[in-house]
């Protein structure tokens, strides 16, 4: 059994951010699901409230042009989103990889990005939609 202290040198090389949040949740007695499902209403609402709170902090930080607070809010959004993933039993590492692969499939047949007039990345001929359903069973 490996016991992790509050900080381990090189920890970021050992665990993904999603796994670090799992460690936090287990340490603090929060439920970490291994199978995808909804939690009880109280937990579902907590997860939604945490994400909403951090999004509001991001809006305020951007309005006041405070990069330190933007960094804090963005990091907290990631943290509470990963926590929600664990609360719902959804492996966000695997989901992220699937979405990343899908996003990279948007390249044109020449291997270059395709943009619309506003600068939005468009879907290329080899685009495939991410299949997140395989991570929900």
Predicted regions and their residues:
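Flexible "arm" and connector segments at domain edges
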Residues: 2-137
């Amino acid at each position: 059994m490996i016991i992790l202290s509050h900080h381990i040198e090189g920890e970021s090389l050992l665990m993904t951010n999603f796994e670090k949040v799992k460690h936090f949740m287990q340490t603090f007695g929060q439920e970490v699901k291994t199978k995808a499902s909804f939690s009880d209403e109280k937990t579902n609402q907590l997860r939604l409230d945490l994400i909403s709170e951090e999004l509001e902090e991001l809006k305020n930080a951007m309005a006041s042009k405070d990069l330190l607070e933007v960094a804090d809010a963005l990091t907290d959004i990631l943290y509470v989103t990963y926590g929600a993933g664990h609360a719902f039993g959804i492996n966000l590492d695997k989901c992220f990889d699937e979405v990343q692969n899908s996003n990279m499939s948007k390249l044109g047949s020449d291997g270059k990005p395709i943009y619309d007039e506003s600068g939005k990345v468009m879907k290329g001929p080899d685009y495939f939609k991410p299949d997140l359903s395989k991570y929900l069973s």
